Amino acid sequence: SGSCTLKTCWKKMPTFRDVGNRLKSYFDGAVKVTGGNSGENLIPEDETVKQPTIKDLVYSMESHDFCEPDRKSGSLGTEGRRCNSTSMDVGGCDIMCCGRGYHEVLAEKRENCRCRF
C-alpha cells in the first residue's frame, strides 16, 4: 500500500487597498509624453524627467478641469456638491470646492424612533 500526498498551489490577489495604493502611486508618478519622429519611442515633455520605462504610466493630453462643468465630457463640475469638511482627501471641501470656498451647515434632525420600553 502506498501513500499519496496532494499539494495545491494558487496565486492570491492582493487586497483592494493594496491595488488602489499601487495605482495611486503610478498615477502620482505619471509622465506627460509626446511621440518621437519614428513613432516608436516616447519623449517626456519635461526634459528633467527620465525616459519612461515599460512599467511607467504615461499620458499625452491633460485632463479637463473637473471643477467646472464640461458638456463635451459630461462632467457637471463640483459646484453645489456636498463635501466632507474634515477630510483631506478628494472628497474633502478644500479639494472638491476648487478654492471657491464653502459653507458649513450644522443641522439637527429629530425623528420618532418608535422606541419601546
From Swiss-Prot:
It is found in: Secreted, Extracellular space, Extracellular matrix. Disulfide bonds join 83-98. Ligand for members of the frizzled family of seven transmembrane receptors. Probable developmental protein. May be a signaling molecule which affects the development of discrete regions of tissues. Is likely to signal over only few cell diameters. InterPro entries: Wnt (IPR005817), Wnt_C (IPR043158). GO terms for biological process: Wnt signaling pathway. GO terms for cellular component: extracellular region. It comes from the Eukaryota. PANTHER family: PROTEIN WNT-6 (PTHR12027:SF72), WNT RELATED (PTHR12027). A lipid is attached at residue 1 (O-palmitoleoyl serine). Its main location: secreted. Keywords: Developmental protein, Disulfide bond, Extracellular matrix, Glycoprotein, Lipoprotein, Secreted, Wnt signaling pathway. Belongs to the Wnt family. Pfam families: wnt (PF00110). This is Protein Wnt-6. Transmembrane segments: none annotated. One of its GO terms (molecular function) is signaling receptor binding. Palmitoleoylation is required for efficient binding to frizzled receptors. Depalmitoleoylation leads to Wnt signaling pathway inhibition. Glycans are attached at residue 84.
